[in-house]
Design a protein with these regions (language model features):
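Thiamine diphosphate
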Residues: 1-169, 173, 178, 305-306, ...
């Protein structure tokens, strides 16, 4: 057990799996799979496994995804890291091929591939084209593809192991704003389920649900509300599909109030699906959601921060909802 960054925890998981499986490959562009951590050896996948297994491609995200998918169909586990500039480029391939081929083969063709999609978290100053967070909903809508979004280094490692070992294609959403987040992470290899939400704080007054880069804001708000006497149950989705409906319903049956918080756009955000599932199963509950406005993120940091949902918005709406 040691304090590790998100990046180090993920590459530690990949390194172990590549050592166990000599056919497993990693495909990337621009960003080399290298990570350092205080008191730990540097991880450099390309140096350890060579360029035949750790492939630095040209800048073509569609091609990267196609090679990853082809490797999986041929029997090799494969992971590709697609940076934020191209996170939407492989959509057609994942939607039309990765999400369907296993079903079209009657389950005979396994697809042990992981598509890591970097999300900028709508970083101030990146402007509209490279600042979007809405790919969470895009990929979660694809049948046959699991879509996960960890919010902590410990979950990031365990969910990466589970994703690599899963026979189905997994879109692994990577909130870039959490890259340098540090926490205690076990040294040994372990798994975190790809279909279970995590209850981060327990309470009876209000359920707040979020995922990925939204969770730090939710936990900050929950702390403020706790000091004001409100007992909040904060739930980290971790997996957008399959979504852990059971945990959501159980919580709202207790609190009777649900607030969802998303960094992605308001229309059809993950919170909308959360509310729909709870509404189908819990009578008499009250609902509210917070999300980014349906508008491209501006380049101006000041304008962007004015639009971005934050802990203050959660606190204000939570008090009105519980009121």
């Amino acid at each position: 057990m040691a304090r590790k960054t998100w990046m180090y925890a993920v590459l530690e998981a990949v390194q172990y799996e590549m050592r166990q499986d000599k056919d497993m490959i990693w495909i990337f562009e621009l960003t080399p799979p290298v990570a350092s951590n205080p008191g730990k050896p540097v991880i450099n996948l390309e140096k350890e496994f060579g360029r035949k297994r750790v492939v630095n491609t040209g800048i073509d995200e569609y091609w990267m995804a196609a090679c990853t998918l082809g490797a999986g169909l041929a029997g090799s586990k494969a992971v590709t890291y697609i940076p934020y500039q191209g996170a939407c480029m492989p959509f057609e391939l994942i939607q039309n091929e990765a999400g369907k081929l296993r079903h079209m083969s009657g389950g005979q063709a396994e697809m042990p591939v992981v598509f890591i999609m970097e999300m900028t978290g709508q970083t101030p100053g990146f402007a509209g084209q490279h600042s979007d967070y809405e790919i969470d909903t895009y990929y979660a809508h694809i049948p046959g593809v699991k879509t996960v979004i960890p919010s902590t280094p410990a979950d990031a490692k365990g969910m990466m192991v589970s994703a690599i070992r899963d026979p189905n294609p997994v879109v692994y959403l990577w909130p870039d704003g959490l890259r340098e987040l540090v926490e205690e992470v076990p040294d040994e290899q372990y798994t975190v389920p790809l279909d279970k939400a995590a209850v981060r704080t327990s309470g009876n007054d209000l359920t707040i649900v979020s995922s990925g880069a939204g969770m730090p804001e939710v936990l900050a708000a929950a702390d403020q509300l706790q000091k004001a006497g409100m007992k909040v149950e904060a739930i980290d989705l971790r997996s957008l599909k399959p979504m852990d409906t059971e945990t959501l319903v159980k919580s709202v049956q207790k609190t009777k109030r649900l607030l969802t918080f998303d960094q992605s756009y308001y229309t059809l955000c993950p919170g909308a699906e959360v509310i729909a599932r709870v509404a189908e199963n819990v009578d008499g509950a009250r609902f509210k959601r917070i999300a980014f406005p349906d508008a491209p993120p501006p380049a101006s940091p000041e304008m962007f921060l004015w639009m971005k949902p934050n802990a203050g918005h959660i606190v204000n709406l939570a008090k009105k909802l519980v009121g």
